[in-house]
Amino acid sequence: MRLLIWVLFVTLVTFVSNTTATSTFTDPQVTSGDIEALTHLLDVESNADAKRFLRTESKNDLKSDADTNGIDIEDEERGFIPSSITNAFSKMKTGWSNFKSNQFEKAFQRMNQKGETPTTLAKRLDIGKTAEKRFEKTYEKYTAWWINHHTNAGT
């Protein structure tokens, strides 16, 4: 049965790879804008590492030695995300980080009240064997918190 399915699959792949698709439109009506976009994509200078200029005259200004008022590359404007959106994201990240820290603190306090030590936590989470990465990170955070808590409580 496997051989039959394999033969059918290979036949299908061979058939599909040997056929050619034909367009339903005989006259594609390619515009000059399409041709320009295509040549821009195929251009040697159009790569991901090259500096892109928003204004074509700024590229000419940078290359001409006769013009003393040339635009510096670093002064070229870029379309970045507005600062209000960036500030909102940073506030959300800070808020989430604070919330997560508070939840870890509460959980660690409850674990400490129940007598959980880093050794018992390591046994429970199988640290050093088949533990997931998040369990190992939780173990490391709890160990650091436990040492800090017991060191500060003793002094």
UniProtKB/Swiss-Prot annotation:
One of its GO terms (cellular component) is extracellular region. InterPro entries: RXLR. This is RxLR effector protein 24. Residues 105-155 are annotated as: RABA-binding domain. Effector protein that contributes to pathogen virulence. Targets members of the RABA GTPases subfamily to inhibit vesicular secretion, leading to an accumulation of secretory proteins in the endoplasmic reticulum. The gene is RxLR24. Its main location: secreted. Keywords: Host cell membrane, Host membrane, Membrane, Secreted, Signal, Virulence. Interacts with Arabidopsis thaliana RABA GTPases including RABA1a, RABA1b, RABA1c, RABA1d, RABA1f, RABA2a, RABA2c, RABA2d, RABA4a, RABA4b and RABA4c. Residues 1-21 form the signal peptide. It is found in: Secreted; Host cell membrane; Host endomembrane system.
